[in-house]
Swiss-Prot record:
GO terms for cellular component: cytoplasm. Its EC number is 2.7.7.3. This is Phosphopantetheine adenylyltransferase. SUPFAM superfamilies: Nucleotidylyl transferase. Belongs to the bacterial CoaD family. GO terms for biological process: coenzyme A biosynthetic process. InterPro entries: Cyt_trans-like (IPR004821), PPAT (IPR001980), Rossmann-like_a/b/a_fold (IPR014729). Pathway: Cofactor biosynthesis; coenzyme A biosynthesis; CoA from (R)-pantothenate: step 4/5. ATP binds at residues 8-9, 16, 87-89, 97, 122-128. Its cofactor is Mg(2+).
């Protein structure tokens, strides 16, 4: 059975990855479908988001990424998918998603919507939250995969962290020196 996991993924978060991984255990193929939405100005282009998703999900052999325009139901039919996969963080998500599922059902009776409750640790997480934190110079390392964090820091042109190209381990951005104790500054300079 083929499932479509549609969204903007601008950027993909650990919450998205949680749904993708869990969906990959339930379905033969999960297609992470990036909507080209001309009414939004994204942080990353569709092509950049597709590359980010492919890199993030390369360990999942039954997951692929693709871009699409138009109605999700039409795209699902083109890809011969039977299921739309959606993540739910809160009751407010459920109300919106249920309405969307009912609307999609009026467009195609052949496609079902399957909801997965987001894992507790990601129940607050959205791409908008990630961008808002990064916009004001906060760390997003714990919210997105390491390579995505680097891309985000570059976009916002902050003192973004550096990554070891071999391990992709992130060295956090320098703290505001006014909040760092003198011993920490000395230790940082010694290393």
């Amino acid at each position: 059975m083929i499932a479509i996991y549609p969204g903007s993924f601008d950027p993909i978060t650990l919450g998205h990855l949680d749904i993708i991984q869990r969906g990959s255990r339930l379905f033969d193929l999960v297609i992470v479908a990036v909507l080209r939405n001309p009414s939004k100005v994204p942080l990353f282009s569709v092509q950049e988001r597709l590359e980010q998703i492919r890199r993030t999900t390369k360990h999942l052999p039954n997951v692929e990424a693709d871009g699409f325009d138009g109605l999700t139901v039409n795209y699902a039919q083109q890809r011969q998918a039977q299921v739309l996969l959606r993540g739910l963080r809160a009751i407010s998500d459920f109300e919106v998603e249920l309405q969307m599922a009912h609307t999609n059902k009026t467009l195609s009776t052949q496609i079902e919507t399957v909801f997965l409750a987001t894992s507790n640790e990601y129940s607050f997480l959205s791409s908008s939250v990630v961008k808002e934190i990064a916009r004001f110079g906060g760390s997003v390392d714990h919210l997105v995969p390491p390579h995505i964090a680097l891309d985000i820091y570059k976009c916002y042109n902050h003192n973004y962290p550096t990554a070891n190209p071999t391990t992709m381990e992130i060295t956090p951005p320098h703290q505001n020196m006014a909040t760092v104790a003198p011993q920490e500054i000395l230790q940082e300079q010694e290393t």
